[in-house]
Amino acid sequence: MAAATMAITSRALVGKPAAGTRDVFGEGRITMRKTAAKPKPARSGSPWYGADRVLYLGPLSGSPPSYLTGEFPGDYGWDTEGLSADPETFAKNRELEVIHCRWAIAVGLGCVFPELLARNGVKFGEGVWFKAGSQIFSEGGLSHPGNPSLVHAQSILAIWACQVVLMGAVEGYHVAGGRLGEVVDPLYLGGSFDPLGLGDDPERFAELKVKEIKNGRLAMFSMFGFFVQAIVTGKGPIENLADHLTDPVNNNAWAYATNFVPGK
């Protein structure tokens, strides 16, 4: 939207004050700046937004805090610690949550699929997620995906340097405000970062945001479970699932928890 300034240039009024202007606009001023268009609000009938949205305990939920208005995806009206009361803190925490949700979704798939493929006869090296990285310290190094002629890593320092450069470049691009296409929200870049045009329809995009945050929160809990499983059982998630399905009585959280009872 181009910058604009209202002016009256009629020859009949040259040199004369526009008496009606103040009467119409009072003491206000009109300022128009170039900015990215704000996303349209979600449809009023959406169950995930607004004052009548779904709350964390459904009909048993109390009144949500006044600062949780249902404007953002994933707002179920639950904030017992008041973490969202300060707008700046809320904006920061919202960004952190969305980013960690995306990481958890991607990493969760990376923990499951290699082990699943390995158990079904696909040969590409170590399939268990917390053991795969240590292969770089073996004599032959680490090959992706189990083929030395493709990507063959033998130096942990080289991998660390690549991660710093690549991830640093991406984060620097994000923080500095660099963009490919018009940016409406730093968390949802759009433009060249949305080649499928998922954000073109505001109503559909609002629903996709809710799906992302819900699946992301589930993925973060899943990753926490993968970490606990790795520490307690020393096995990957697929093997733990197979063991539980084979013998659910002796392979469950309670059975493993009782192994840590003092004196047992």
From Swiss-Prot:
List of residues binding chlorophyll a 3: Q135, E212
Note describing how the cofactor binds: Binds at least 14 chlorophylls (8 Chl-a and 6 Chl-b) and carotenoids such as lutein and neoxanthin.
Transmembrane segments: 98-118, 150-170, 218-238
Listed GO CC annotations: chloroplast thylakoid membrane; photosystem I; photosystem II
Residue ranges of coiled coil: none
Annotated compartments: Plastid, Chloroplast thylakoid membrane
Binding residues annotated for chlorophyll a 5, in chain numbering: K211, Q229
Binding site for chlorophyll a 4: N215
UniProt protein name: Chlorophyll a-b binding protein 48, chloroplastic
PANTHER family named in the record: CHLOROPHYLL A/B BINDING PROTEIN
GO biological process, alphabetically ordered: photosynthesis, light harvesting in photosystem I; response to light stimulus
Binding site for chlorophyll a 2: H100
Keyword Transmembrane: yes
The keyword Membrane belongs to this UniProt entry's keyword annotation: yes
Residue numbers of Phosphothreonine PTMs: T35
Family: Belongs to the light-harvesting chlorophyll a/b-binding (LHC) protein family.
